[in-house]
Swiss-Prot record:
Listed name of the protein: U2-agatoxin-Ao1o
CC terms in the record's Gene Ontology section: extracellular region
Chain's role: Insect active toxin causing rapid but reversible paralysis in crickets. No activity shown in mammals. Does not show effect on mammalian voltage-gated calcium channels.
Family that this chain belongs to: Belongs to the neurotoxin 01 (U2-agtx) family.
Cellular compartment(s): Secreted
UniProt organism field: Agelena orientalis (Funnel-web spider)
Length: 69
C-alpha cells in the first residue's frame, strides 16, 4: 500500500513539473500576419507602416491612410 501511495505522489510531482511549463504557441502562417493585435485592431509598431483588416496585417498607404490589399 505504501508503494502505491509513493508511486502516486511521485507521478503527481512529475506531472506538476510538466504542467508548470507554459504551452503558448502562436501560429503565424504568413509574414504579413505578424504583428497584428486583434484586441485593438492595430499592428505592432515594429512591423512598419501597416494596419489590420480582420486578423491580417496589411500595408498602409502613407498618402491616404487606408489599408491596401
Amino acid at each position: 500500500m505504501k508503494a502505491i501511495i509513493s508511486l502516486l505522489l511521485i507521478s503527481a510531482m512529475v506531472f506538476s513539473m510538466f504542467e508548470a511549463v507554459p504551452v503558448r504557441r502562436r501560429f503565424t502562417a504568413f509574414e504579413g500576419e505578424r504583428g497584428c493585435l486583434p484586441h485593438n485592431r492595430f499592428c505592432n509598431a515594429l512591423s512598419g507602416p501597416r494596419c489590420c483588416t480582420g486578423l491580417k496585417c496589411k500595408e498602409l498607404s502613407i498618402w491616404d491612410s487606408r489599408c491596401l490589399g
